[in-house]
């Protein structure tokens, strides 16, 4: 089994502990698994400190595109024009990474889907959806969503759409009930 881990926060010891626990549990449960952990290039040093030392685990930097691609991709997530990505070389390189994976796991920690409204976080989740990869959303905080601006409302809409795509979801049930999900 090939497992791709995305969106791993590296900002505190709790994130580190959750990451190491997830990796060790996956390796124990799936001894033949190969795990790749994709991270932002700017966070490489943090990942060196987090790394689980095992021959079945590989850490690598996210594909870096042209300087305008992050702005382009985040705008396209916002406007739901993700079909434009297929012409961008960075997107095509990301496609090969995601299609390698049998399952994509959004790593534990962070509140990127809610208060922080991290469009990069949504971008990586949308890639898994676009490439039809099974997606597990594990041990994350989710919401609350501010709704003051159009951008806030669009982020909430896309986030809730993604919530229905996840094959495995591990967040607090109380929070789901607050959104009157069915």
Describe every region a protein language model picked out.
Residues 167-182:
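A short, active-site helix/loop in glycosyltransferases that binds the activated sugar's phosphate group
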Residues 1-150, 154-161:
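Aromatic- and Gly/Pro-rich donor/ligand-binding loops
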Residues 164:
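Basic phosphate/pyrophosphate-binding loop/patch that engages nucleotide-derived ligands
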């Amino acid at each position: 089994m090939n497992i791709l881990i995305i969106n791993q926060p590296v900002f505190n010891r709790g994130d580190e502990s959750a990451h190491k626990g997830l990796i060790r549990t996956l390796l124990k449960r799936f001894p033949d698994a190969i795990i790749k952990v994709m991270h932002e290039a700017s966070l490489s040093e943090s990942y060196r400190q987090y790394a689980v030392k095992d021959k079945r685990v590989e850490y690598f930097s996210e594909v870096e595109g042209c300087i305008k691609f992050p702005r382009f991709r985040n705008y396209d997530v916002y406007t739901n024009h993700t079909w434009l990505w297929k012409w961008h070389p960075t997107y095509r390189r990301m496609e090969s990474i995601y299609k390698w994976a049998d399952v994509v796991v959004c790593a534990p920690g962070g509140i990127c889907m809610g208060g922080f409204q991290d469009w990069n976080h949504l971008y990586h989740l949308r890639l898994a959806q676009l490439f039809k990869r099974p997606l597990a959303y594990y041990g994350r905080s989710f919401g609350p969503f501010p709704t003051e601006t159009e951008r806030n409302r669009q982020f909430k809409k896309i986030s809730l759409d993604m919530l229905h795509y996840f094959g495995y979801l591990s967040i607090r049930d109380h929070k789901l009930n607050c959104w009157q999900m069915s």
